Amino acid sequence: LWPEVNDAVMAGYDSGIISSVSLRVSARASHSAMVSAGMRPGLGVGLHLVLCEGEATLPRKHIPSLVDNSGSFVSQPLEAAWLYRRGGGLREELKAEIRAQIEKLLATGLYMTHMSGHYHLHLHPTVLSILKELASDYPISAIRKPCGSMWRFSRRQSSWDRRAEAVFM
C-alpha cells in the first residue's frame, strides 16, 4: 500500500518474523513491493485479490459493471457481495479482472504461493467458483481460509449482520 509499510513488512521477513506476504497488485506502491519481494527468494508471495475498496487492474472499458468512472471498485464489502451475486456479463468481468491481477503478479517473475482476498471476498461463491476455474490455468495451489468467522453475530443481530449473512448463505 505505502512504501513505509512495504519496508516494515520486508524488515519483518529479514528478521525472521514473517515468512510470506500477500500483495495487492493494483495498490499505489505495489511495484516497489514486488521488486522487494523478488530480492528475497525464500519469501512466499501470494496475491491479495482486490475486488472492493481499491482500484482495478483493468481499464474501466473492460469491466464497466465492476468499477466507477475513476476505475475504483465499490468501497463497501457488503455492497460488493450483493453486486457479485448478479449473473450474466458481470461474472465474465469479474473473471477478466481476477485473471488480470493474477497475470500482473506472475509477470514480475514471482512465484505465486497462495491467494487471499480483500475483506475475504475471494470466498464469495461467485468469486470462488471463478478461482476454481482459473486454478487449472495458473499456479493457484492454496487459497486462504480465514480461521475465524467472517462476521461476528450477537444475540441482537443488526440489519447489517442479517444482510451479510444472507449474501453468503
Regions found by a protein language model. Name each.
Residues 3-27:
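A short alpha/beta connector and helix-capping loop motif
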Residues 18-22, 42-48, 111-116, 141-142:
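Structural preference for beta-strand elements that scaffold enzyme active sites
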Residues 24-28, 48-52, 118-120, 148-151:
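Active-site beta-loop-alpha junctions enriched in small/polar residues
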Residues 56-88:
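Active-site gating loops and adjacent loop-to-helix segments of metal-dependent hydrolytic enzymes
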Residues 32-43, 54, 58, 129-138:
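Short amphipathic alpha-helices and their capping/turn segments at secondary-structure boundaries
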Residues 9-15, 31-44, 65-71, 106-107:
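Acidic (Asp/Glu)-rich catalytic clusters
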Residues 90, 99-169:
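Catalytic domains of cell-wall/extracellular-matrix polysaccharide-remodeling enzymes
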Residues 1-2, 83-95:
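Active-site mouth loops of central-metabolism enzymes
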